[in-house]
Amino acid sequence: MSQSRVLALVVCAAPPVLRIAELIDLLQEDGWTVCLTATPTAATWIDREALAAQTGYPVRVEWRKPGEPEPHPPATAVAVVPATFNVINKWAQGINDTLALGILNEALGAGIPVHAFPNVKEQLTAHPSYDRHLRSLQDAAVAVTPLPAELDWHTAVHRLRFA
């Protein structure tokens, strides 16, 4: 019997998030249970109800209150797709001001695979903090794979298959 694979999928506000349902379909076909958390801005770009119906779990944006049950099962892997300039820089610095960043920060100490799939404008990749923060995340065992310009979700699914 194979072990259940649960992916905590964090989504950020970059154009690929508009097609995140396609990635979720592919991940589910590959045997993943997908639990979605969105940054506050990404939450305004996506259809949270449709994605909750697709995954079977609520799309989380806000922290739960003390005593409230955890709405998602424990993750066996975490991925941030698309990972934006803002989230990469905040995450690398340990900033924990949103649920999405909280999940990413906790994942670094959880002993599970963590993947980042950046989608960042070329001008922003030239910013001096970007490379430094990507290296910092890689040093913390985050697997970094830039999203291809043609947005082939199979790249992400392939990388996560071995998580």
List the predicted regions and their residue ranges:
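A cross-family phosphate/adenosyl-ligand binding-site feature
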Residues: 1-163
